[in-house]
Each structure stands twice: as structure tokens, then as C-alpha cells.
Amino acid sequence: ANAALGRHDRPPFRRGWRLDRRVMAETAGRIIEDFGVSPRRLDLTARGFSGGNQQRFVAGRELACAPPLLIAVHPTRGVDLLATRFIHERILAERDRGTAILLVSADLTELRSLSDRLLILYRGRVAYEAARSEIDHARLHRALLGLGAP
């Protein structure tokens, strides 16, 4: 059922008044396979997976539907380096496919490597904004500390 979360009310997961469990299982199986979720068992609930594998599954579920806008909030928190690299590659592939991506992260390295444009918010206001190629590291770090913010 986790594979259909947020989309359970429409096809292909819903048929009339009922959920199509076969389609949900097939989708979950594809996510588990494509995103390297371990253990590769469809009978486990979300609690049966480690935090990192739960995160892999969520990333897979959200990317599986080819969204026009992807809001990724701490997409690699709690995952190992291999999973982080894999999720980063998937996010970049989505960007290359034309998906608009809003990435929220406390990991500045992640933000710099994945973002075309960087916005730093401080107390709800934009404290710094720049294209990746135009980042002024001194101003960026001041903004991160709340120095010189509006």
C-alpha cells in the first residue's frame, strides 16, 4: 500500500471502488528493484525496513510517477553513501528530463552539487540568492549565519 500512498484514489491503483492490490504489489516490486531497497521482500511493512531503505523506497515512490514538480526535502537524510549517490543521480536525471525541482536540505554540499540556483532563507526571507556558477562563498556563509540578512 505504501507504493500507492498519495495516489491511491486514482488509476492505476484504484479500480472502481476498490484498490488494485496486484498493481500496488507490481509497483512496489519495481521500486524495490530499481532503488535497491533491501531486503527485497514485498511482505514487509515500512517498519520492516531500515531508515535508509525506507528513504530509498519513498524516493522511488515519488519519482516513479514522473512528476512535473518534485519537492525533495532532505532526500538523503539517513541513507548510506551509495544510496545518496543513487538518489542524487535520480534527481539529476529528473532535472534533465525537465522536471522542476525544489530541493530543501541542510547539507550545503548536496545543495551545491544538485542545484542550478541556490536560495538561502533566514527567518522566512531570502538572505542569499545566486546561480551555482555565481556563488560568492563569503556572502553565502554570512547568509547561513544570518549576518546581513534583510
What is the predicted role of each segment?
Residues 1-150:
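Glycine-rich phosphate-binding loops of nucleotide-dependent enzymes
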